[in-house]
Amino acid sequence: MSGIGPDQALSIAAIATAVAPGQGGIAVIRLSGPSAVRAVAAITVIPGQQVWESHRVLYGHVVAAGGVERLDEVLVLVMLAPRSFTGEDVVEIHCHGGVIAVQQVLARVLEQPGVRRALPGEFSQRAVLNGRLDLTRAEAIGDLVGARSQRAAQLAMAGLDGGIQKKMVVLRERLLDQLSELEARVDFEEDLPPLNGEALLQELQAVRLELLTLVADGERGSVVRHGLRVALVGRPNVGKSSLLNLLSRRERAIVTDLPGTTRDLLESEIVLDGVPITLLDTAGIRATSNAVEKLGIARSRDALASADLVLLLFDLAQGWSDDDQALFALIPEGVPCLRVGNKADLPLKAEPVAETVAASVADVRLSAVTGDGEQALVQAVLERCGALGEQPLLLALNQRQSDLAVTAAEALARSEQVAADGLPWDFWTIDLRQAIRSLGEITGEQLTESVLDRIFSRFCIGK
């Protein structure tokens, strides 16, 4: 896909680095478009005989209107079309970090004719429109920026390196080969040897199965990319806060022997085997007249409803109680739950019957104090949430890509049914064309600008 949209006659500008008040040694202001070089040249004083050539770094100052007052000392990096990220003239102004100087420089840039503030993701969108990136690579940039774990970053890099695009091109070409065979038979059947319908059908089935495998991997990748919300639930003083501290490796919760110490919803961000996890340590749910504790319990119920997984802790030493069963009944239908028997290091105090019930109920046994059973819990969490698989996860489609892959697979299934029904060749081609179109949409070969606008609106400004 390439071409210039009506708004690409204007240059765009934005701060391309995250700037926090008083922080950051260097900030980068990026411009792209036909006016980029002229706009920066108009607001800078570049001493000596420095030449505005592509892929050169110039030293100078950004000056206020009037050309006298210096606003900042800067480096200017020039990248002329087509050898730039967007395929247009790109200029970066590297100025001092912070807030005031950066905003002053950006304001001067935006004062120049033909320059406007960039929309979220617009630099990447122009790269796609100008044929510098396919859509899967552009989306991978957003995934890399937002990666919350090393594993998520690795999956993003696989997409940025073209893994998804190359896979889709190969699958699409295989379908195009079959379509050309079918269409040739429709138009020139009497001049060609008989078509091997069985071989063609096997090829369609093979592509469909590959697409479904990619969709399944995409579901695993979604867990890695977006993470999980895991709620820790249990009676007061069963060890929820101790487990939170064990998994997060720091004292996030107040741990005492006083039941009901946690009265608020505590959150801890951790990474388990490459999967970002938000642990929600809830207040113990019980009947109470304390107004503060009631608020914490209400938040606990909300956490149950929003969680991807619930860890229901109970005291192995005390056994599975009626209160534990009542808590189990509060977990919303459809929310996965692991019943975790804690305090496995303590001597049993329960009656033999309660002890037997506890042993049979527990999905995982551990001691949050000693750490015994921690790895078994981690594996159980990842398995229950679909983050584990038989094969290593090398590529992961995002939701948009997965939806289109499903559409393509469904179209191929219909094509296979048409073949099974013995209908003529031209009926085979209808759904086959739909599958080919869907794969083209994944890489951006067949997309409207309105769809691109929606995709890139999720990006941060400056990317």
Swiss-Prot record:
It is found in: Cytoplasm. Binds 1 potassium ion per subunit. GO terms for biological process: tRNA methylation; tRNA wobble uridine modification. Residues 227-386 form the TrmE-type G domain. One of its GO terms (cellular component) is cytosol. (6S)-5-formyl-5,6,7,8-tetrahydrofolate binds at residues 30, 92, 132, 463. It comes from the Bacteria. One of its GO terms (molecular function) is GTPase activity. Its EC number is 3.6.-.-. Keywords: Cytoplasm, GTP-binding, Hydrolase, Magnesium, Metal-binding, Nucleotide-binding, Potassium, tRNA processing. It is an enzyme of class 3 (hydrolase). Mg(2+) binds at residues 241, 262. GTP binds at residues 237-242, 256-262, 281-284, 342-345. K(+) binds at residues 237, 256, 258, 261. The keyword Phosphoprotein does not apply. Its cofactor is K(+). Exhibits a very high intrinsic GTPase hydrolysis rate. Involved in the addition of a carboxymethylaminomethyl (cmnm) group at the wobble position (U34) of certain tRNAs, forming tRNA-cmnm(5)s(2)U34. Belongs to the TRAFAC class TrmE-Era-EngA-EngB-Septin-like GTPase superfamily. TrmE GTPase family. Homodimer. Heterotetramer of two MnmE and two MnmG subunits. This is tRNA modification GTPase MnmE. It comes from Synechococcus sp. (strain CC9311). The lineage of its organism: Bacteria, Bacillati, Cyanobacteriota, Cyanophyceae, Synechococcales.
